[in-house]
Regions:
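Short, polar/acidic, helix-capping and beta-turn segments at strand->helix junctions
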Residues: 1-123
């Protein structure tokens, strides 16, 4: 088992790994819409969704995978009213079939984020 860290995605905000690689499966921690270079949160749900997915891509690339390897995602949104917007953007990042997914509305996310996305990928 290997803990993954890359500077191409935001550093963990607490005591957890950006991802854990167990050999056949990679478990990615939730990514917010934070710019990895500055730590700044993108403005609005559209920009945050794009950045969260870019951050997941960067973590997966660190272990030689892409979003095409993703089999499951969990999307956390602060407002289910943003569901359609998140879906529209999310759908543009996956080619060759969508992974299984859950979407959950929660009371709050770190740093006041509006969306967080985590994933599980396989080799």
């Amino acid at each position: 088992m290997k803990r993954i860290a890359t500077t191409n995605a935001p550093a963990a905000l607490g005591p957890y790994a950006q991802a854990v690689d167990t050999g056949d499966t990679v478990y990615c921690s939730g990514q917010l819409g934070l710019d990895p270079a500055t730590g700044a949160l993108a403005e609005g749900v559209q920009a945050q969704t794009h950045q969260a997915l870019k951050n997941l891509k960067a973590v997966l690339q660190e272990v030689g995978l892409t979003l095409d390897n993703v089999v499951k995602t969990t999307v956390f949104v602060q407002d289910l009213g943003d569901f359609g917007t998140v879906n529209e953007i999310y759908g543009t990042y996956f080619h060759g079939g969508f992974p299984a997914r859950s979407c959950v509305q929660i009371a709050a996310l770190p740093k006041g984020a509006l969306v967080e996305i985590e994933c599980i990928a396989v080799r």
